[in-house]
Amino acid sequence: MRRAVCPGSFDPITNGHLDIVIRASKLFDEVVVAVSINKNKATLFTIDERMELIREAVRNHPMAPSNVVVDASHGLVVDFCRARGIQSIVKGLRAVSDFDYELQMAQMNNSLAGVETLFMSTNPQYAFLSSSLVKEVARYGGDVSHLVPDVVLKQLRERAVE
């Protein structure tokens, strides 16, 4: 079985993230969305909330792929891959600046565990999009309805004003 992981903090998942996950689901038998837990990083949503938002976003997507699963990830992505027999990491690239960092990570992951990284170019309509930017715009009352899945929108608005 061809399996891949899409790692990230997904705080919250954006339409850009979802686009990469859906596209990856067409290329692999199973795609695991690995939601990272970093105790040193403050998040707007808890790990359980982020995982449930991702599950609902995938379930509510018009394609609703059945080969996407969501799991929590502690530590190195390559350790997550090794423990689950996953051979590939899928990463979305928004800009050349993303590539510089992600290439170094891909080479390190390959040297540590022989895990390959597949880079997918982001849909141009999401090239500027990041969870941090979405949270910032929402915090100031801006319209982010076109940037996040519907299931995320209500919770994001409630949390962003707290």
UniProtKB/Swiss-Prot annotation:
Keyword field: ATP-binding, Coenzyme A biosynthesis, Cytoplasm, Magnesium, Nucleotide-binding, Nucleotidyltransferase, Transferase
Transmembrane segments: none
Enzyme class: transferase
InterPro entries: Cyt_trans-like, PPAT, Rossmann-like_a/b/a_fold
Biological process annotations from GO: coenzyme A biosynthetic process
A single Gene Ontology CC term: cytoplasm
Molecular function GO terms recorded: ATP binding; pantetheine-phosphate adenylyltransferase activity
SUBUNIT field: Homohexamer.
PANTHER family: PHOSPHOPANTETHEINE ADENYLYLTRANSFERASE
Protein name as it appears in the record: Phosphopantetheine adenylyltransferase
Organism the protein comes from: Frankia alni (strain DSM 45986 / CECT 9034 / ACN14a)
